[in-house]
Amino acid sequence: MKKIVSIALSLIMIISLVACGSSNTKTTDNGSGATEKFVVATNAEFPPYEYKEGQNFLGIDIEIVSTIAEKLGKQLDVLDIAFDSVIPAVTSGKADMGAAGMTITEDRKKSVDFSIPYTKAVQMIIVTEGSAIASVDDLAGKKIGVQQGTTGDLYCTDDFGEENMVRYSKIADGVLPLKNGQIDCLVIDDQVAINVVQNNSGIKTLETAYAEEEYAFAIKKGNQELLDKVNEVINELQSTGKLAEIKAKYIK
């Protein structure tokens, strides 16, 4: 009987370990010794703002939210999910905050509160070398690749029609279709576009920008205490020059 109980307990322990290992979150120790977690939802397919190297999360947003977690006296717990799942994770309470190179929009404001902006961006167009597309005016009737749920997706759908949209879970998945002529261009935030072009030959960004915007962090409506603290940290990072240092580290 003792042997049966021992075997059963061993099986329970194994199942528990497997369950723990299947999580799509990553806890980053901020050195504070805190046990309470600060869960931040992101989509780590958006360099230089958030991306992964091995099991480590890196990027501008990650460094900022690490500082926020430290100021809160909590451990940062990164929840890596699809971009269009970030706001639902915040509104449902699955995450404390969303940090995913997210643009402030009136539609998103209906679901979440936004921190003060911490950076600005513009949408950029990526085309193949030798493409006849020279500006936004040339996109009518073209097949446009976008990352699903991003402002590039929203703007292009409004301006050029649902029938011309080709959506990808990450913008890098659109590079090969672009080169093969399956789509005519990609539209994504400027620093991400530059990163994509730097890592892939035969493509370029157009000098003409398309839509200016501001990034901020998404927080559940009514959580004024967290919103105030996040704004305080952003202001401090800006006033001390630390925010500029973080950006310079990732934007060359």
Segments from the language model and where they lie:
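Bacterial lipoprotein signal-peptidase II cleavage site
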Residues: S16-A34
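Flexible hinge/capping segments at coil-to-helix
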Residues: T28-S32, V127-I144
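Extended ligand-binding regions for polar small-molecule ligands
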Residues: I62-K71, D137, K143, Q148-T150, ...
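A ligand-binding cleft/hinge motif common to bilobed small-molecule-binding domains
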Residues: M102-K110, Y155-D158, K179, D184-A211
